[in-house]
C-alpha cells in the first residue's frame, strides 16, 4: 500500500503543475477509466500495487480493464516531452489527494 511517506519523497507542488497541464484532462473527469483525482474509491484498487509500479505504468503507458470497461493511458499521458521525474511527481500528487 502507498503511504504519505511514499508520496512525500516526490515534489508534490511540481506534480500539481504537471497534473494541471497534462493529466487533468482525463483524470479530472475519469475519462477512459482514468481514476478520478480526489475520489478515493477510484484509487483504492490501484494503491496496493505500490507507488513505484503506478509510476512505471504511467511512464510506459497502460492498457487494461477496470470493472468490465477497457482502460487506456498513453505513455507519459501522451506527452513524450515529460521526464520520468515529472510523471512521478504527478502520480504522487494524484495519489496524495486520496490518502
Curated annotation (Swiss-Prot):
Keywords: Electron transport, Heme, Iron, Metal-binding, Photosynthesis, Transport. Disulfide bonds: none annotated. The keyword Electron transport applies. Heme c binds at residues 23, 26-27, 73. The keyword Electron transport applies. Signal peptide: none annotated. Binds 1 heme c group covalently per subunit. GO terms for biological process: photosynthesis. GO terms for molecular function: electron transfer activity; heme binding; iron ion binding. This is Cytochrome c-555.
Amino acid at each position: 500500500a502507498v503511504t504519505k511517506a511514499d508520496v512525500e519523497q516526490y515534489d508534490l507542488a511540481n506534480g500539481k503543475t504537471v497534473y494541471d497541464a497534462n493529466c487533468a484532462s482525463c483524470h479530472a473527469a475519469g475519462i477512459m477509466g482514468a481514476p478520478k483525482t480526489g475520489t478515493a474509491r477510484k484509487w483504492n484498487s490501484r494503491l496496493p500495487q505500490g507507488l513505484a509500479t503506478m509510476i512505471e505504468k504511467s511512464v510506459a503507458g497502460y492498457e487494461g480493464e477496470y470493472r468490465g470497461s477497457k482502460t487506456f493511458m498513453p505513455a507519459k499521458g501522451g506527452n513524450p516531452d515529460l521526464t520520468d521525474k515529472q510523471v512521478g511527481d504527478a502520480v504522487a500528487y494524484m495519489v496524495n489527494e486520496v490518502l
